[in-house]
Amino acid sequence: MYTRYSYNPSLGRTYVYDNKYYKNLGSVIKNANRKRHYIEHELEEKTLDPLDRYLVAEDPFLGPGKNQKLTLFKEIRNVKPDTMKLVVNWSGKEFLRETWTRFMEDSFPIVNDQEVMDVFLVINMRPTRPNRCFKFLAQHALRCDPDYVPHEVIRIVEPSYVGSNNEYRVSLAKRGGGCPVMNLHSEYTNSFEEFINRVIWENFYKPIVYVGTDSAEEEEILLEVSLVFKIKEFAPDAPLYNGPAY
């Protein structure tokens, strides 16, 4: 008669393994891969060490340079549910000569040499009716064929939600960035139409932007559309003053 503490040959023999010499096969393979990835990561970091001498802004909008805002227009638009509306068509009243002339005279002094580093299209959206609970949607395309005519209204397809400040910002700089024109005030004074086509659209994208809401009802929203110029300034060639105060 066997008890639970008796030795039963039919139960097989029991072996005790020394863990010092036996390891789990999966852990061995994982450790080998981990070491290999670590060595590759170290080599990759060494190749990037020379770049530590340079600084770059996480958000180009907050980078070096002066921001000059040109408000194109403020309008109230009605947006139906499940649809998005075109914001700017780049051929209407947003390019009034008076608006640009006032902006140029205030933002670009004649005595300074200034270069456009980047141009941002900034769209600020606000609901006109109180106590509305919805989020703003937006999507854009930077480039299209010159003869393409965008639709005024489209269906919502994979949009992105606008941030908490209800501001949608798009960088229009082409690859390489920057605008080679230095004396912007004189370039603009020569010809308004030529300045827009040759300076702005030659160096920056002309985007198509649609906005909408995730509301199930028709919403009335106030749009403020503006261009923000990121400007790099150069000191004017002015003679030094001589006198007791200097």
UniProtKB/Swiss-Prot annotation:
State the name under which the record lists this protein: Polyhedrin
Q: Which residues form the signal peptide?
A: none
Q: GO terms for CC?
A: viral occlusion body
GO MF annotation list: structural molecule activity
Q: Give the highest taxon in the source lineage.
A: Viruses
Give the family, as the similarity comment puts it.
Answer: Belongs to the polyhedrin family.
Cite the InterPro entries for this sequence. Answer: Polyhedrin
Q: Which UniProt keywords apply?
A: Viral occlusion body
| Protein function | Major component of the virus occlusion bodies, which are large proteinaceous structures (polyhedra), that protect the virus from the outside environment for extended periods until they are ingested by insect larvae.
